[in-house]
Amino acid sequence: MIKSIFKKVSIKMASSSKILSWSFGEVTHSNFINFKNLKPEPNGLFCLKIFSDFELCCLKKKCFCHNDKFLNLKKAHTGYKVGHIKLFYPAVHIWYIKSSHSNISNILNLSYKILEKIINFKLKVVIKSYDIKIKKFNLFIFDKKIKNIIFTLSGAKALKKLLSDRELFIDCLILKIKIKKCNSFSKLFSILKHINKILIFYYSGNKPSWMVLKKIPVLPPRMRPLIALSEKKFASSDINELYKIVLERNYKLKKMTTYLDPKQLLINERISLQESIYALFDNEKLINPILTSSKRVLKSFSSLIKGKYGRFRQNLLGKRVDFSGRTVITVEPNLFLYECKIPIYIALELFKPILYYELKKKKIITTISFIDDYYKKNKKQIILLLKNKVKSYFIMLNRAPTLHRMNFQSFKILLTEDKTIKIHPLVCLCYNADFDGDQMAIHLPLTNNAKVESNYLLLSINNIISPSNGNAIIIPTQDIIMGIYYFTFDFKNKSISLNDINDIINFFEFNNYNFQINIKFNNKKKINTTLGRIIINYLFFKNFDYFLNIVFKKKILTYLIKYLFDFNQLSKIIIILEKLKKIGFLISTYSGITISYFDLIEVKNTFLINKVVFKLKYNNNIFSIVELLNNFFVKIIIKKIQINKTGLKKTNNLFIMLDSGSRGSMLQIKQLIAFRGFFSKSNGDIIKDPIFDNLKNGLNMKNYFISTFGARKGLTDTSLKTANSGYLTRKLIDVSHDLVIYKIDCKTKTGIKIFLNSYFTLVELYKNLYGRLLLFSVSLKNKILLKENTLIDNKVLFLLIKKKINTIFVRSVLFCISNRGVCCFCYGIDLSTNKIVLIGVSVGIISAQSIGEPGTQLTMRTFHTGGVASYFFYSDNLIISNSGFVKFKKCKCVINKFGEVIIVSLYGEFMIFNKIILEKYKFYYGTKIKFRNGFLIKKNTKLINFNDNNFYIYSENIGYVYFKKENNIVKNYCLEDNKFYYKTLKNFKITIINKSIKKNYFIPKNFNIVVYCYDYIFPGEIIAKLVSVTILKSSIIGGLPRLSELFEARIPKLKALLSEIDGVCKIKFSHLNYIITIISKFGFYKEYTLSCLRKLYINNGDYVKIGDILSDGKPDLNEIINLISINYLLSYFVNEINSIYFPQNIYVNCKHIELILKQMTKKVKIIFSGESSCQQGDILFLEDAINENFSTLVNSRRLSYYKRIVTGITKTSLESLSFFSAASFQETNKILVNSAIKNRTDYLLGLKENVLVGRLIPAGTGLIKYFKKKSKSSKNNLDFKNRKKKFYINYF
């Protein structure tokens, strides 16, 4: 039995002597009970002598003694004692031989197929030989006759002999000599694999022969129960049946050996015993598993511990609890934000023991079962007693699926006679609940600590701000928003002069809530406003310090609630929210807003538009036409929808719903009024025949059936993405659960360098900087403006902008160097409280929930978006904010005939300097700049001015154009330019010839060639272009699949080519491939081969740097971290994930993504082992590699070299320091086996492992006990000392 207080859990391999020391007796009989007297069989699987604490009076079958103590046996008495089975012939453990990386195979250096043949007596192994020709380990066919001077063995006994004869230390020395002499990479890999496994056994002290079993432990009966259903029927655990088969076969083998049966019969019986032991440990893995009479596979040890219904996940990580219930939810607008109504029947059941205690004290009832009868007779008394008791309790409500912490909140209890839970309408957004049959679970906290937590931490009014992005989550929605919008809408009626707020409210009530009145209100200045706007402004700003004379929409109300929260006005927010709720429901009821068929305006001349589309459809790209029509119709809809054509009202109901943000989107209205657009098939491919009809006028038969494809796809996607996003959340939780705030400051000296001028909008800058801390102090004119570790809030941010500070260094969780978890200063503010994060906050769990929760809103399909120009090339109007001199750096430019500088290299740097660098920008190919090197420019000057978003290819030299008119180009009409161009169908080559100089240009597919053959052109002239609307639609996997690809650090299917050296490019065309050669200035070169179907972003003669993207596709994360830097990886990773969420209007704060990336980048790979104890190719934690190098440096030895790697979240979770956490995630058997071989110890530092063993988690309120324990010795030091002592080798 496990002691209640323990600090760590260890796992080791068990030898036969260890199993014997656990055992309380040998099990010899296969029978469970004696069916005559229904007593357990002596020496059987339920023998009381072995498994019970009680001593029996006698062992007779027909025992009727009065002192028969096992008749009153309790479950606890058969709970913890272990027995054993002594095998008559050794058997191999299936987990050590049939796993993906067979341990026995690695140690003996024999393949799995050979081992299987040895076990099944098809081959025999030479154990000892006196013949020079035949050596040890030689294999022979079993039936072959061999001389007497050679000793051979077969079966599990042979493997046991081979494993016990291994001298691990000598094997290591031999293999090290082989490594030095090895020339082949494949041989080196196999030797390293072999030496790794041997070293693990050598350092751990485990003997390889223990993998072959002589004794098997028998679990206590409580873990494999036998339940009586009736007098002669019993339900037994599958483990009992498997034990029974093992015992029967073992007994049969023993009998056959004693009677000296023929050799072949003995062999067959040994094989059957081996198979039964395989089945006991892992029945599902066998080709012919043991089945029941109904042909069901019996559940073995493996199935008991692994999977969703195994011990780890069903019984340890998640448990069913008492004092809980569930029922349907309905809305109750008259509640306060912190209240909910519970049905009396549920409350009576939950509080039954408490009521029983009170009634028993008064001597009214004697047993708990009488409460129901007493309630029927004395309803009023029980309800009064219940109401008194309910006052001191707060109930916890939970709605599944619990994707984030806002799904679990506590409320004050009110009782109702209805049979549903009634909740406040404003908490629906937190729970993502509606009232179409949703159910909620009720939980009653009982202990004092649980009550305190539910009364304060979980209370709904303390969860107004979302921890994922810092935005308000308890906000007015739907009907309330619509009512407030209508209340503050300007109907442009005649205005009345009123100055006092009380007069305005009285006037509103006196006129039967007529709010369509304009008022001339005197607030410092006379304002012509509406009655509704004055009342809403009075709620937010009582003294009218500010006055917002606008229509109040959802976004504005959200910003105002966040504004009040920033200034610590929580009590004011709650009052305002309650008043907004009442006003919203009142006005939406009085207004009677609803939509009808006549609210859907008609777009005129649609017939002519469709006619034009029909003609153009066969000459142009269909995607471009739909995009043009989309923009065209949206403008018409916005203009026409605002005013109802009947003229009865001044507002359109549909427009109110859309503009207020209460319901609907422009996409839905476009489908109702204009056209439906593209639909996808069931496999995700887009049907290239868009629907130009709308839902108002109806669809024809063809379009109706095309619509059904999309509807089916939508339904299947919903079910798939729910499962996938749930799995993604689980993976994120598993990788980040041990990230908790344990320190105030880690004293790191590394962080992120941020160029304030590189952000084109203030919103972007605010989102990235707000809530971070400065790494170094900020100076201006040799005076410290801001000290280090200053929190960047609104004031600091505006000070930086005002003082024109260009570069700052900020702290990031990615560079936090805390021994355990993360420090407060690196994390910054807690977004849900708007204050510096407190010690004990489980930031890892919050990050995982923040990324995983909006996952269900993402799309599963492959969507079509802009390709080359929109993804890799940036263009925008840029205005300089400082006066200074122009300087170009690291770029190749040409000057066109208009005197404009055009960048023709992959990218270039542009700087404004005046003694020091004031501003720095990065421009990409094709950027036109008005100024040259050394020019003086003033602030607020427009630097670049793009009139269009097209992508152009420019000439770099003067000369004649030459190209062959082959099948690769076709003449095509361009709708945008109203001209005919040659369009490229494949990659195409254009040459510009000037005397002896030739320059080749490779034009990608789908570009329009602007020049003609034999044209004479100058530098900077356009050769070819890709119009923004007709950009090749590249299929980019969007939504969840792309998110999963990034977090798993998979190599993309279409991988971008990255330059590994600095140098000049030379491109050749060979067969169907490009041969790209990058020649360095030092003479060496690097050659790449790329398919001609891919797009190149470079031309002949371009100078590229390490890490430059040379072709289309997505870069590999491991290449980014090794070729460029971890800082670039951070910015790329954050931008990629935000680009997935942004189209769905979801914002996830950068720090959450950084925390996950921290976990993904904490490993290194050893490139050169030097004289350290590491092996080449080992994957270690970064801290372990640094510690190892320190110890080698102390001993004056050669250091090891390593490189940072990015590991996927699944792999990171499985390679966790805690084997408990890893085993409960997935691949349970493999992790437990590898951990046992290494003698691993789990120090229970994370949250999951503490939940598994039933302790308080080391986070939040559970952290106080851990701090008390740490006063004597630091657990961090212990952890790292133990990790340093151990030899951590990653299995291949």
Swiss-Prot record:
One of its GO terms (molecular function) is magnesium ion binding. It is an enzyme of class 2 (transferase). Its cofactor is Mg(2+); Zn(2+). Zn(2+) binds at residues 746, 816, 823, 826. Binds 1 Mg(2+) ion per subunit. Mg(2+) binds at residues 434, 436, 438. It comes from the Bacteria. Keywords: DNA-directed RNA polymerase, Magnesium, Metal-binding, Nucleotidyltransferase, Transcription, Transferase, Zinc. It catalyses: RNA(n) + a ribonucleoside 5'-triphosphate = RNA(n+1) + diphosphate. Gene3D superfamilies: 1.10.132.30, 1.10.150.390, 1.10.1790.20, 1.10.40.90, 2.40.40.20, 2.40.50.100, RNA polymerase II, clamp domain (4.10.860.120), RNA polymerase Rpb1, domain 3 (1.10.274.100). InterPro entries: DNA-dir_RpoC_beta_prime (IPR045867), DNA-dir_RpoC_beta_prime_bact (IPR012754), RNA_pol_asu (IPR000722), RNA_pol_N (IPR006592), RNA_pol_Rpb1_1 (IPR007080), RNA_pol_Rpb1_3 (IPR007066), RNA_pol_Rpb1_3_sf (IPR042102), RNA_pol_Rpb1_4 (IPR007083). GO terms for biological process: DNA-templated transcription. One of its GO terms (cellular component) is DNA-directed RNA polymerase complex. Its EC number is 2.7.7.6. Belongs to the RNA polymerase beta' chain family. The RNAP catalytic core consists of 2 alpha, 1 beta, 1 beta' and 1 omega subunit. When a sigma factor is associated with the core the holoenzyme is formed, which can initiate transcription. DNA-dependent RNA polymerase catalyzes the transcription of DNA into RNA using the four ribonucleoside triphosphates as substrates. This is DNA-directed RNA polymerase subunit beta'. It comes from Carsonella ruddii (strain PV).
